[in-house]
Amino acid sequence: ATKAYFTQLYNQVKDLQITKGGPIIMVQGENEFGSYVAQRKDVPLEEHKKYSAAVFQQLKDLGFEVPFFTSDGSWLFEGGALPGALPTANGESDIAKLKEVVNKFNNGQGPYMVAEFYPGWLDHWAEPFPTQKPEQTARQTKKYLDNKVSFNYYMVHGGTNFGFTSGANYDKEHDIQPDMTSYDYDAPISEAGWATPKYNALRELLKTSETPAVPEKMPIIEIPKIALTKTVDLADLKAKISPVYEDTPQTFEQLNQGDGYVWYSKKFTQPISGKLELKGLRDYAIVYVNGKKVAELNRYYKKYDCDIEVPFNATLDIVVENMGRINYGSQINENNKGIISPVIINGQTITGDWEMYKLPMSQEPDLTAYKNSGKVNRPTLYQGTFTLSKTGDTFLDMRDWGKGIVFVNGINIGRYWSVGPQQTLYLPGCWLKKGKNNIVIFEQKNETLQKELKSIATPILEDLRPEKGQ
């Protein structure tokens, strides 16, 4: 699989190597593999090394001519470094330690490089937005320059995880820590491409007589009111989807679906009550009995069960969201989504006649043929239009909403969630047009029937409301 991927990659970039006059000066075969090795002590170190050596050999055999390098925390070189590839230390601010560890794993010599120098940090939903003072970033930059250490800012511009592209981490307190839609990162250049005080501090440090002027901001607009004129219950869309029938709930992968949502449905011919256990939830679910909301279950908060009462001839519905795939550490290979283990009620495994409805939301839902049917505490799609005389970047204000995604002119601009700290969604002006524009919002919780939406001129990325997600 890696060889097939690398072959396609090589064919696209082979002429872009510096040896052929292009911009590619080095190639990294793995990213922070040492972190994975450290967490997978059940696998012998020599087996890990065989894997990473094979990866670099494939790259070499294809014809890459530029130097290879690895990228790990300085304390993880034992698992990540590889002979023939320059070891670089992510996030290492101690010059002496950097040189010591690189010398140890690179035949007593440099060059010395920090492949990931963090001027900020990524953020997860329901957690504080990390920041770093401009003077701290500038001071560390000067320290590297004074000691002839090469470095790469990660990130200089973070940007946005549009659509379903955001990843995730995990820790002891949370089985998943989904990344926010915004990847602003408190980087020198903001999510919307603005120069920040941090950028100006670095520019002052690095500028020469030939440094060009800072570009002007892209035009910014505010949309004071977007009327939402149609509300459609997600069940109405589900009714037009052919279900997959199985004895047990199927994962996203078994359903050949990568992103979005799956609606799991089970009809009961006999009543049952007790504790509903969904230990295999990946990642977020709202549970309904006969259309009435019973509970929210959530992998971030490790909430996997609730009390439930299913009467005679009732229907249990569980709408599950994939909140993003873990992309760091040993759990990168445990990334199935949906319901991945049995559903249990009152100690009884629930099998037989499960229905799965695939809702990947890979395209903006077409609500033209549907009548208004949205209700409070039901998964609901909202549609509206707005007219612009001019276009520009803007930020949709989602502070009054619960959890969901937004499409504008057919483009999924990302997830929102009331827990924060992100409360706005960046909407680039290039996706807007003069005249009529269309918006569709899928609101999963729908605790209030919404009538309108607005956009504002500045982002809100530090408004944390974690209690709203519990």
Residue ranges and their predicted role:
Residues 232-265, 358-382:
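Edge strands and adjacent loops of beta-rich recognition modules
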Residues 2-81:
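Active-site neighborhood of glycoside hydrolase catalytic domains
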Residues 321-352, 446-470:
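Glycine/proline-rich low-complexity spacer/linker segments in large multi-domain proteins
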Residues 274-288, 316, 386-409, 416-417, ...:
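Aromatic-lined ligand-binding clefts that engage carbohydrates, nucleic acids, or primary amines
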Residues 179-233:
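Aromatic- and carboxylate-lined catalytic core of secreted/periplasmic carbohydrate-active enzymes
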Residues 61, 92-190, 194, 205:
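Catalytic-core region of carbohydrate-active enzymes that cleave or remodel glycosidic bonds
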Residues 1-4, 30-49, 86-93, 118-136, ...:
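The substrate-binding groove and active-site-proximal loops of carbohydrate-active enzymes
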Residues 175-176, 180-184, 198, 250-254, ...:
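A cross-kingdom feature marking solvent-exposed beta-strand/loop segments within repeated
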